[in-house]
Amino acid sequence: MKKIIALIAVILAVNVQAGEYPDISITDLEKAIKAGKVVVIDVNGKNSQTKRGVIPTAVAFSNAKALAKQLAKTKKDTLVVAYCGGPSCSAYKKGATAAEALGFKNVKHLSAGISGWLKAGKKLAKK
C-alpha cells in the first residue's frame, strides 16, 4: 500500500511540473514497433480502444497501477511512446508521466496521435 501511495504522489508531482515530452514521428514509431524496441501507450480510453482499435502493440492505459503491472518486466531504458487523439489532445501526459514515474527514461509523445496515424494510412489493431 505504501508503494502505491508513493507512486501516486510521484505521479502527481510529475504532473504538476511536467513539461512537454519529445515528439516521435509516425515513421520512427513504426520502425521501432517493427523492431520490437518500444512500448506504446494508448491513452484514448476503453471505448475508443474497443471500437476503433489502437496502434499495433499498444497497451491500453487506464491508470498508473495497471500500467505498473503491464510494464513490470520491461527494461527502464526501453523507448516508451504515449499518444492520444491527435495534436490538440493532452491526455497522453497521463501515460507519459506514469511511465516516467515508474523509472522509464526515454519517454516520447506521438503528437500526431491516432488521428495522424490513420491519416498516414496506417492500420490499427483491435483490442
Place the predicted regions along the sequence by residue:
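Structural scaffold elements adjacent to functional motifs in cytosolic proteins
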Residues: 40-42
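Hydrophobic h-region of N-terminal signal peptides that target proteins for export
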Residues: 9-17
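Rhodanese-like catalytic fold shared by cysteine-dependent sulfurtransferases
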Residues: 2-4, 16-27, 35-38, 47-79, ...
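Glycine-rich, flexible N-terminal cofactor/catalytic loop recognition
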Residues: 32
